[in-house]
Regions:
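Extracellular ligand-binding/catalytic regions of CAZymes and related secreted enzymes
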Residues: 2-18, 153-242, 264, 270-272, ...
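Helical hinge/lid and interdomain linker segments adjacent to catalytic or ligand-binding clefts
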Residues: 21-99
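Catalytic beta-strand/loop cores that center a nucleophilic Ser/Cys/Thr
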Residues: 31, 107-181, 188-193
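A glycine-rich, often tryptophan-bearing local segment used as a flexible ligand/cofactor-contacting loop or short
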Residues: 66-137, 145
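Terminal, non-catalytic domain-edge segments
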Residues: 218-220, 288-320, 417-420, 424-425, ...
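Low-complexity, Ser/Thr/Pro/Gly-enriched N-terminal "stalk/linker" regions
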Residues: 285-344, 363-401, 429-464, 503, ...
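Well-ordered alpha-helical segments within folded domains of soluble proteins
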Residues: 337-357, 399-422, 471-491, 521-538, ...
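A structural motif
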Residues: 717, 721-897
Length: 897
């Protein structure tokens, strides 16, 4: 039933032509004045309440200090309403009890939904308000709850009905002879806050205006072209109108289904064309695909700079940020997500390397080189244990306690692009690390999360013999990137082992197709499965791979919308209201939601489909490639005033309401997030593959490289427990590097002032490393035979004047550390605990010296001996007995001419 306000008495001063008073600052007031204009109603805005409200047909009071509530003096307003007036107030406080009051809280997971039918909005329709501030009030008396807050699963509609726990969002409260509409949050904030879906929010404010004034609301007519925005030269377009009655238009319109009117197909010349329907206009551009795709790439490349994705180093030398988080703030901005992800680094690097060649853009190659250098030098794990060769996916490597899960999908992409960028040894180590954690039978990842503890406890051999559980053998989400890396390694080296492990896994997955584990959705799985199949077919021409690609193409075709995108289907969607917002999830709620995924689906389809056509020559792949790339070009955000988003894509796009919107159930990457990798880079890689005709995978190899055998030998030596002595040195930039079995690793971000020194701590199986930092203090780390490299730790506040010297003291099972302090004294500490337990600094006597001492362990005496020159030029010697140093002795008289 349609909810309508009953008629109420009006004062003699109020007439149908009386204006509406809008109280509040211009920006939030504009949301309501737009609704009033739409209804043909006059309004007057005030910063403060007028003294006399009796001359107004209604009063609207917007929140002027949101996200903080504003305390109002409502005495005059209360009198106006009780006398028969109608008023709307939002998110405010008063001391009289006229306005509902309640605890103010953030609606983190809850969203607003309609509880009754409103004009043009059905019950249970969702309005996403992005963690708004709200008052948790209680419905009292005869108040009617028009909209509620609650944890509801659904995209446009609360598909499981209202939740058990709700609180009001919009109330209709009888007061005396009048009515008060009260919103517990600032509904007027929907414009600045970018609330979605936009048309529904606009309609809600129009409904409020209609309820306040009794004005009949105009029908909400929608006019668009199909396809929208742009169409390729020589391809047709039609005009579409959604309306309950046939509209007046330039073109003849035919009702194709209730409420939908279409024109005949139009073939238009290149250029822009505008169609008018009543007082509404819609424009579509026509032009060549190559120009459109190139424009799309140019704008996406420019977005990286404009949005600050390279931090404060435009050459990429500090990396690239992950992107923008999902949680839109009160200013309508997305939080910057600075996480330095290796997969984002490498995908972005490849996109910029391709763009450097496409656009003669030398800076692109500089950015690519710097990003790949950071990944190879800073993120690859080189400690000689079961983590060897893997890449830390969330920034520079640190010690074992700080190492993240070595996710198989992230590591697959990083390894692939390391190979493509010319870092072949590093890439092959990444590939071998993935092979060692795969099933010996199927060649697929056993545990794609690859937690460090699992790898270290189980080891490579046990992992390879473990069963693959939970359908993880049938998910391209987790398996495809490693398969692509294997295939690329084969193309580079000719080593049959790489092709064999890739095809073993693909044979299994293709043989089970269309069965799949739906990590995100069936549509995303299809888009992700294509790329390794393309690579495998490229090298083998195996009919099974082509048939599987054709099947995937048929599925994608069945899910393709009129603008080219592939709708999400069969997803990991919350099965109840209670399950909403508690885990990673798809960005749609039910099959039929017109939503595409620009994080896990669309970009990967855009990447693979041009290659599928190039390698197979089958028209269906070209048609699908055109469709998905056309779609990406249409939905690319085009708003020059928005530096944060202009030129990029957000995760969820609703191609029916034509805006970025989707189910906001995903805890990590919701519908409004932006990723430099996974989304932007793969999208433009796909476009540039189309533009350049590049095959992506190398040609079939004609010779065999010896490098894979040497890489496997490194892993075999680690598995056998063979030792590999390490040396340490200072680079020109001050970073300390470790060289072990010819493999280099940068040790943290410490900048050293001198050369490192180290001693073997045999009882604990580690090397202890010390260096003077540019801060003048001594720093220590370790290389443990099992758990690997530690973090740098500063040893006290002592200021050094020279380099440290160290020696292992087997009599005490301790590392003895000596330095010359800035005070001229020699200072000592011992490392007596298993890990990091250094004693406090203590001076060795009271003499002053010119440099650090020479130190050795005297096996005959069982003590540590020290030799140093004091400031008088005398040769001084002492030794450490137990934990004490004997007095310095003068040995100068033993020196002869």
């Amino acid at each position: 039933m349609l909810y309508r306000l009953p008629s109420v008495g009006q004062s003699d001063a109020v007439t149908v032509s009386a204006p509406v008073a809008v109280i509040g600052p211009p920006d939030p007031a504009a949301a309501f004045t737009a609704a009033l204009d739409q209804a043909g109603l006059a309004s007057i805005r005030y910063d403060e309440f007028p003294v006399d409200l009796s001359g107004y047909s209604a009063v609207i009071v917007v929140a002027g200090r949101y996200p903080e509530p504003e305390r109002l003096d409502v005495a005059g307003l209360a009198e106006y309403v009780r006398a028969g007036g109608s008023a709307y107030v939002e998110f405010a406080l008063d001391d009289t009890g006229f306005l509902p009051q309640g605890e103010i809280r953030t609606a983190h997971i809850e969203r607003i939904f309609t509880t009754v039918a409103l004009a043009g909005i059905e019950p249970l329709q969702i309005l996403d308000e992005h963690s708004s501030q709200a008052q948790q009030v209680v419905v009292r008396g005869k108040a009617v709850e028009l909209c509620s807050y609650g944890t509801v699963a659904g995209t446009h509609e609360a598909i499981f009905g209202p939740p058990d726990v709700t609180f009001p969002a919009l109330l209709d409260i009888p007061v005396g002879d009048g009515r008060l509409l009260y919103a517990t949050t600032a509904l007027s904030h929907h414009v600045k806050g970018r609330y979605k879906p936009v048309r529904r929010w606009r309609r809600l404010l129009q409904v409020i205006v209609g309820q306040l004034t009794g004005v009949q609301l105009a029908e909400d007519i929608e006019v668009f072209t199909e396809p929208r925005v742009w169409v390729a030269t020589g391809e047709p377009v039609k005009l579409v109108v959604r309306s309950s009655t046939k509209p007046v238009a330039e073109l003849d319109l035919v009702e194709t289904k209730p409420g939908r009117f279409e024109s005949d197909l139009q073939y238009l010349d290149d250029g822009e064309h505008t169609f008018a329907v009543g007082d509404q206009h819609v424009t579509v551009a026509v032009g060549p695909r190559a120009e459109r795709y190139r424009r799309m790439v140019d704008r996406a490349i420019a977005w990286y700079d404009r949005a600050g994705m390279f931090y404060d180093a435009p050459d990429g030398s500090k990396g690239v940020a992950e992107g923008l988080s999902n949680e839109i703030d009160a200013e309508g901005k997305l939080p910057f997500r600075p996480v330095p992800r290796g997969d984002c680094f490498t995908q972005t690097a490849h996109a910029f390397r391709m763009y450097a060649d496409l656009a003669d853009f030398p800076r692109g190659r500089t950015i690519a080189d710097n990003l790949m250098r950071l990944v190879v030098e800073e993120e690859q794990l080189t400690d000689r244990n079961q983590l060897y060769g893997s890449f830390e996916p969330r920034g520079a490597r640190t010690d074992l306690t700080g190492t993240n899960n070595l996710f198989a999908d992230d590591n697959g992409w990083i390894s692939l692009f390391a190979l493509m960028s010319g870092h072949v040894e590093s890439g092959l180590r990444g590939v071998e690390a993935l092979i060692r954690t795969s099933s010996a039978d199927l060649g697929l990842q056993v545990d794609p999360w690859r937690t460090p503890s699992t790898l270290l406890v189980k080891g490579w051999d046990e992992l390879s013999r473990s069963p693959i559980e939970d359908g993880l053998d049938l998910t391209s989400h987790w398996q495809s990137s490693a398969q692509c890396a294997y295939l690329y390694a084969y193309g580079l080296t000719g080593d049959q082992g790489y092709l064999d492990i890739a095809t073993r896994g693909l044979d299994h997955m293709a043989g089970q197709h269309p069965r799949a584990r739906l990590e995100t959705s069936r549509t995303c799985e299809a888009g992700r499965f294509l790329l390794p199949l393309v690579g495998a077919y490229h090298y083998t021409r195996k009919p099974q791979y082509l048939e599987t690609m054709r099947s995937l193409a048929g599925y994608l075709k069945s899910r393709q919308g009129p603008d080219g995108g592939f709708a999400e289907w069969d997803g990991k969607c919350p099965p109840s209201n209670e399950a909403y917002g508690v885990d990673e999830a798809a960005i749609f709620a039910a099959n039929g939601d017109p939503v595409t995924d620009q994080l896990y689906g669309t970009p990967f389809a855009a990447w693979a489909l041009p290659l599928a056509y190039r390698i197979t020559g089958e028209p269906v792949f070209e048609e699908l490639a055109h469709g998905v790339l056309d779609y990406l070009s249409r939905i690319q955000i085009d708003d020059p005033d928005d530096e944060q988003l202009d030129g990029t894509w957000q995760r969820a796009f609703d191609f029916d309401s034509w805006e970025y919107f989707g189910s906001n159930a995903d805890l990590g990457w919701g519908p409004y997030c932006v990723e430099t990798g996974w989304s932007v880079a793969p999208s433009i890689i796909g476009a540039m593959l189309y533009l350049t005709g590049d095959n992506f995978f190398p040609p079939a190899p004609s010779s065999l490289s010896e490098l894979p055998a040497s890489i496997r030998a490194e892993f075999d030596a680690i598995a056998a427990g063979q030792p590999a002595p390490a040396t340490f040195t200072r680079r020109d930039d001050g970073r300390v590097i470790r060289i072990q079995n010819g493999v280099q690793a940068v040790l943290g971000d410490l900048t050293a002032a001198g050369e490192p020194v180290w001693a073997r701590n045999e009882p604990v199986g580690a090397d202890e490393i010390y260096v003077r930092g540019t801060d003048g203090h001594l720093h220590h780390t370790y290389l443990d035979d099992r758990v690997g490299q530690g973090r740098w730790q500063q040893l006290g506040d002592l200021e050094l004047a020279d380099e440290p010297v160290v020696a292992f003291n087997p009599g005490a099972n301790a590392i003895e550390v000596y330095v010359l302090g800035a005070d001229g004294h020699i200072h000592h500490c011992s490392m007596i605990d298993v890990r990091g337990g250094h004693t406090p600094w203590e001076p060795v006597g009271t003499l002053h010296f010119t440099g650090s001492p020479a130190v050795l362990y005297d096996e005959e005496l069982g003590s540590v001996r020290l030799v140093a020159n004091d400031t008088a030029g005398q040769d001084r010697r002492t030794r450490k007995v137990n934990r004490w140093h004997l007095p310095w002795q003068d040995y100068s008289h033993w020196i002869t001419a």
